[in-house]
């Protein structure tokens, strides 16, 4: 506020109108997006300062030891010449005035002996002393300032995804082939066939019994029946005028006909020999090659009966060889005799 002092001679100052107050300026809201700093790429770490390795002190210069002066040369003293020895002077006789003067006889000239110098003095060889090296005093190590390396900034580690291995399928075990040892082939034994005498059939008495037909032979299904045994009809003889005949004997029915081998059983001798050799080594390929061609034209039951007949002719143990023979028939030759087959009794 202005303080006005009333003064009679000072007019009132004119009142200046005040400027109207302007409304405050309102800044519009800034629509600029916020300033985003780009991600700072880590600076490569500076190479650490190269530190020179401590220098090894140089060796001190080689100081030659003082050389000892050689001995002064030996100076020979001057040789003093020897005085020649003068012969003693003979006293001269007094001169005689009356005779001629005798000749003056001079002493013979004696040559001077040569001057012989003494041998030179040989001094021993001087051995130089080894040089003395001063003791090595290493320099004190200079303090090395600590090496301050800038911190190494590693980039962020991004984990690698785990390695998924395919499932391991185990290999199927390889079947090992059975070890088949070659069968021992024995040479065929051809024994002499026993002399078979025909059975002696006694002639029955001539009786006129009533005709009894033979019962039919029961044959299994795969068996091809042999032709029935046709017996000739019994022709009764006319009665003789005899006394009354005795009572007729009991009628015994004839047994059924035994099946026989339709081929020569001796042809299967080689097959039975091979089967006899297979008791200890097991059934092999030789039995198939030997027996199957011989039994090819026979039916199942005939083949088994022929083997039984040949085993009996060979006088072998039928209880041991028959199971082997039946197994060869079924497995190798494709023949199927009746189940629980047994050789017919003779």
Swiss-Prot record:
Residues 11-144 are annotated as: Disordered. Gene3D superfamilies: Plant lipid-transfer and hydrophobic proteins. It comes from the Eukaryota. Transmembrane segments: none annotated. InterPro entries: Bifun_inhib/LTP/seed_sf, Hydrophob_seed_dom, Plant_LTP/defense-related. Residues 25-42, 51-81, 89-144 have a biased composition (Pro residues). Pfam families: Hydrophob_seed (PF14547). This is 36.4 kDa proline-rich protein. It comes from Solanum lycopersicum (Tomato).
């Amino acid at each position: 506020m202005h303080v006005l002092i009333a003064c009679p001679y000072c007019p009132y100052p004119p009142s200046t109108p005040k400027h109207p107050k302007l409304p405050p300026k309102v800044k519009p809201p800034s629509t600029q997006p916020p300033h985003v700093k780009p991600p700072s790429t880590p600076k490569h770490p500076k190479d650490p300062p190269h530190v020179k390795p401590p220098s090894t002190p140089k060796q001190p210069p080689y100081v030659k030891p003082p050389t000892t002066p050689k001995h002064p040369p030996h100076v020979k003293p001057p040789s003093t010449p020897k005085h020649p020895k003068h012969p003693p002077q003979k006293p001269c006789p007094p001169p005689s005035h009356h005779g001629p003067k005798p000749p003056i006889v001079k002493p013979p000239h004696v040559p001077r002996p040569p001057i012989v110098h003494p041998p030179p003095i040989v001094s021993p060889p001087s051995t130089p002393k080894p040089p003395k090296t001063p003791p090595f005093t290493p320099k004190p190590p200079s303090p090395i300032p600590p090496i301050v390396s800038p911190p190494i900034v590693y980039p962020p580690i991004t984990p690698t995804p785990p390695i998924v291995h395919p499932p391991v399928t185990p290999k199927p075990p390889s079947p090992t082939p059975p070890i088949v040892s070659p069968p021992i082939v024995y040479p065929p034994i051809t024994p002499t066939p026993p002399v078979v005498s025909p059975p002696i059939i006694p002639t029955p008495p001539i009786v006129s019994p009533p005709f009894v037909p033979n019962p039919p032979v029961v044959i299994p299904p795969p068996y091809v029946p042999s032709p029935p045994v046709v017996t000739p009809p019994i022709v009764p003889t006319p009665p003789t005028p005899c006394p009354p005949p005795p009572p007729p004997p009991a009628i015994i029915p004839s047994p059924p006909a035994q099946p026989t081998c339709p081929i020569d059983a001796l042809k299967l001798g080689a097959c039975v020999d091979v089967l006899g050799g297979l008791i200890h080594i097991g059934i092999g390929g030789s039995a198939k090659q030997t027996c199957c061609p011989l039994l090819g034209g026979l039916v199942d039951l005939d083949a088994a009966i022929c083997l039984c007949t040949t085993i009996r002719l060979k006088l072998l143990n039928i209880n041991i060889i028959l199971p082997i023979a039946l197994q060869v028939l079924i497995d190798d030759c494709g023949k199927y005799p009746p189940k629980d087959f047994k050789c017919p009794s003779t």
